[in-house]
């Protein structure tokens, strides 16, 4: 059985819409996993004395709202431990995701962290790392045993696949529905996805559906509805068009969920609601914090958002770094799994408190990052478990 190093995710603090911080089961039927190379059983050579460790990062974008924050914390971690990070932006295009792993391996990276889109991409990614003796870990993602059993078996048996850091997207989706139905009193909810089949999107969608089912079971005389998704891609214009389509199809729409897409579809959704003159009348919730979130919560153009999880790839980086150093043993019958917590905010005060410790400064100092690099895998998981506004406030009290 897969070994799970679970971080506390949606605690009582989540109910208070704060003090709680992409992914989920992957898309449908995945491509069959290629057979492992016979060379993959050989261990990678540890870096020579004084040799600088180089870790590759395959990411959808290192420049958008979430991606740039991920890059900032990864660059800080690399500086703290004397390593180097090389980035390849993929746009979540399948061919570019798999090609990025080949590119990073060819560039001499001893390890790679990857945010893939679908499980199918992990077959070639893992095979490439096996063939090149390069360590691999996922961030914002985990391969689904249920949906992709062959690929799950492949990564589990790989001597170079260390594990995955991801969020519990089903619980995230359920909590956003709870906020809309219980706290906001909304009943006609329109849903905006980003890319069909994206692993994280599917997890959140399942959470939204479970949240609606739970509400309706408890309140049969006051049911809530959730529309079929309109897809926005990852652009602001796509978000605007999707929101306009939902409002046109159901004039009684009183809430919109911009499920993700790293902030851009949310911006378009807000613009569409503003253009329709329905700010406040239609409550908007989303995942992935945007820079002006505090102002949006203050003026009523947003009701709540989950996010603050940009340190997720930091923990994948630390897993790969320690595997390269020879400090972590990679199992060939399981993989490490760290579930990372979200932070939920529902007011400008909530966001201002968050921004003080996560935007105006990083949640970890250089000294703390260096100390983190020396943790065992068990203690690294414990460190992820306590990641929250309260934890950072305690460590960086002002």
Locations of the language-model features?
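Positively charged n-region of N-terminal signal peptides that target proteins for export
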Residues: 1-12
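A residue-level marker of the well-folded mature domains of exported/periplasmic proteins
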Residues: 22-398
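C-terminal motif of bacterial Sec signal peptides marking the signal peptidase cleavage site
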Residues: 17-21
């Amino acid at each position: 059985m897969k070994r799970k190093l679970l971080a506390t995710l949606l605690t009582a603090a989540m109910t208070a819409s704060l003090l709680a911080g992409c992914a989920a089961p992957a898309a449908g039927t995945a491509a069959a996993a290629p057979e492992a190379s016979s060379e993959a059983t050989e261990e990678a050579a540890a870096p020579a004395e004084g040799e600088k460790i180089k870790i590759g990062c395959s990411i959808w974008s290192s420049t958008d709202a979430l991606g740039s924050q991920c890059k900032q914390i990864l660059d800080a971690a690399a500086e703290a431990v004397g390593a180097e990070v090389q980035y390849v932006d993929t746009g979540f295009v399948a061919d570019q995701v798999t090609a990025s792993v080949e590119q990073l391996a060819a560039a001499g990276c001893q390890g790679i962290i990857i945010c893939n889109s679908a499980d199918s991409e992990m077959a070639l990614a893992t095979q490439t790392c096996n063939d090149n003796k390069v360590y691999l870990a996922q961030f914002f993602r985990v391969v689904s045993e249920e949906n992709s059993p062959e690929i799950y078996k492949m990564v589990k048996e790989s001597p170079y696949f260390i594990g995955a850091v991801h969020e519990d997207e089903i619980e995230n989706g359920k909590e956003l529905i709870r906020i809309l139905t219980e706290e906001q009193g909304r009943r006609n909810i329109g849903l905006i996805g980003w890319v069909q089949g994206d692993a994280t999107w599917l997890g959140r969608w399942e959470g939204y559906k479970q949240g609606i089912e739970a509400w309706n079971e408890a309140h049969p005389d006051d049911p809530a509805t959730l529309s079929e998704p309109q897809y926005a891609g990852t652009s602001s214009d796509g978000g605007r068009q999707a929101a306009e389509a939902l409002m046109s199809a159901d004039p009684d729409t009183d809430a919109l969920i911009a499920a993700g897409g790293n902030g851009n579809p949310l911006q378009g959704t807000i613009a569409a609601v503003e253009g329709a003159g329905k700010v406040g009348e239609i409550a908007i919730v989303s995942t992935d914090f945007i820079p002006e979130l505090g102002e949006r919560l203050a003026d009523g153009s947003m009701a709540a958002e989950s996010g603050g999880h940009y340190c997720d790839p930091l923990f994948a980086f630390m897993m790969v770094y320690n595997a390269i150093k020879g400090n972590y043993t990679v199992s060939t019958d399981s993989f490490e799994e760290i579930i990372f917590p979200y932070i939920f905010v529902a007011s400008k005060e909530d966001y201002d408190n968050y921004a003080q410790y996560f935007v105006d400064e990083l949640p970890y100092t250089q000294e703390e990052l260096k100390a983190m690099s020396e943790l065992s895998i068990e203690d690294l998981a414990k460190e992820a478990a306590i990641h929250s506004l309260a934890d950072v406030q305690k460590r960086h009290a002002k």
